[in-house]
């Protein structure tokens, strides 16, 4: 499938999904105005949402710009020392000092 057609499927899928959201909001507003209980979204809105999901997924899958997910391509650029270096996971305010005080009493 050509790239342009895949983009068209994506745009159509997103626009149908936005219309689905708008329809659901309008339905909810209508139920509030008429004091009816909310029992769920109507069937046509659910079908419209599923159709938009399939159109958008089809467009994304056929866009031909998917990047392969391989660890070797990302890890080839790093040195061996940087694999396990994660400073964001270093915690200095932990319960170790309190446990040390309790255990040494």
Swiss-Prot record:
GO terms for molecular function: inorganic cation transmembrane transporter activity; magnesium ion transmembrane transporter activity. The chain crosses the membrane at residues 4-22, 44-63. One of its GO terms (biological process) is protein insertion into ER membrane by stop-transfer membrane-anchor sequence. Part of the endoplasmic reticulum membrane protein complex (EMC) that enables the energy-independent insertion into endoplasmic reticulum membranes of newly synthesized membrane proteins. Preferentially accommodates proteins with transmembrane domains that are weakly hydrophobic or contain destabilizing features such as charged and aromatic residues. Involved in the cotranslational insertion of multi-pass membrane proteins in which stop-transfer membrane-anchor sequences become ER membrane spanning helices. Its main location: endoplasmic reticulum. One of its GO terms (cellular component) is EMC complex. The gene is mmgt. Component of the ER membrane protein complex (EMC). It comes from the Eukaryota. Keywords: Endoplasmic reticulum, Magnesium, Membrane, Transmembrane, Transmembrane helix, Transport. The keyword Membrane applies. Belongs to the membrane magnesium transporter (TC 1.A.67) family. This is ER membrane protein complex subunit 5 homolog. Residues 23-43 are lumenal. Disulfide bonds: none annotated. Residues 1-3, 64-105 are cytoplasmic. It is a multi-pass membrane protein. It is found in: Endoplasmic reticulum membrane.
